[in-house]
A protein has these predicted regions:
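Jelly-roll (double-stranded beta-helix
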Residues: 1-293
Length: 293
């Protein structure tokens, strides 16, 4: 059965600390989550300075954060003393972690997504962890005028090396104008499409830049590019209830989430010892980042 569009929601403009513009697609009042995905921010800005992209230390519980960059480089530090610049940053908060994300030098273009994946009930208090993956290790398919990168999960027999705690589908699609593609995706997975560039059509309905399209159930997905486009397909097996999404936390109860917020306010979360402020003056064009740490 072919998947069709159930609803289309346009991402809302917001700002990160430092005034970087982001387009927030999840969560929405009308759509709280898609599979395990409970949060999705899209950013696309030029001349991004260290002052503009500086998300200071903040806590997470019960989820995984996924930073996936189409272009540019983000610098991650956390309370496990990880410090890593890279294209795919996959952090497991589990029972609790503190982290920060920055740029250490001006980026000509910073374009990418940050998503959060809520952990299943029995994994929400696992030990925190962090993994970084270069984009080159992710499988890529060439299908009928489209290049598809398997960020997480499996597509047409191609399996991502990124380990997850539940079944996910997370695919980055770059497609040429006029190309049409048919995919077979796990029928039990909830799915949505978010358009990061250009526009596409599904069954004659257009999905434009900054649109999040929730899809109906099915095992086949067909789409056509009305112009050169880039979008992600995301989702997976549904998160079981009760699932509470509160500030930066995914928990079983509201009480647990509120306690996590109190713990943060009371300084109970571990610090990010390697976090520091970067400024444009810190770096010349050829500066070595390691000299700043």
């Amino acid at each position: 059965m072919k998947r069709t569009i159930e609803t289309i929601l346009t991402a809302t403009e917001s700002y990160l600390p430092g005034d970087l513009i982001v387009y927030r697609a999840l969560p929405r009042r009308e759509l709280r989550r898609v599979g395990g995905f409970v949060f999705l921010d899209h950013f696309d800005q030029t001349d991004v300075t260290p002052e503009l992209f500086d998300v200071p230390p903040h806590p997470h519980v019960g989820l995984q954060t996924v930073t996936y960059l189409f272009e540019g480089e983000a610098f991650h530090t956390d309370s496990l003393d990880n410090e890593q610049a890279g294209e795919v940053n996959w952090m497991t908060a589990g029972r609790g972690i503190t982290h920060a994300e920055q740029v250490t030098k001006t980026q000509p273009r910073m374009h990418g997504l940050q998503s959060w994946v809520g952990l299943p009930h029995d994994k929400r208090k696992v030990e925190p962890a962090f993994d970084n993956f270069p984009a080159a290790v992710l499988p890529m398919l060439e299908i009928d005028g489209a290049s598809i990168t398997v960020i997480a999960g499996e597509l047409h027999g191609n399996i991502s090396p990124i380990p997850t705690y539940q079944e996910l589908s997370y695919f980055d699609v770059v497609i040429n104008e006029g190309a049409s593609v048919d995919l077979t995706i796990h029928p039990e997975h909830e799915l949505a499409i978010y358009v990061a560039d250009g526009s596409i059509e599904i069954s004659g309905t257009q999905i434009k830049l900054h649109d999040l399209a929730k899809l109906t159930a099915g095992d086949e997905l067909s789409f056509t590019a009305t112009e050169n486009a880039r979008f992600v397909i995301l989702g997976g097996e549904p998160l079981p209830d009760p699932t509470v999404i509160y500030w930066n936390f995914v928990t079983d109860t509201v009480g647990e989430a509120k306690q996590a917020a109190i713990d943060w306010q009371d300084g109970e979360f571990p610090p990010v010892n390697k976090y520091r402020k970067f400024t444009s003056e810190d770096l010349g064009e050829e500066a070595d980042r390691t000299q700043l740490l």
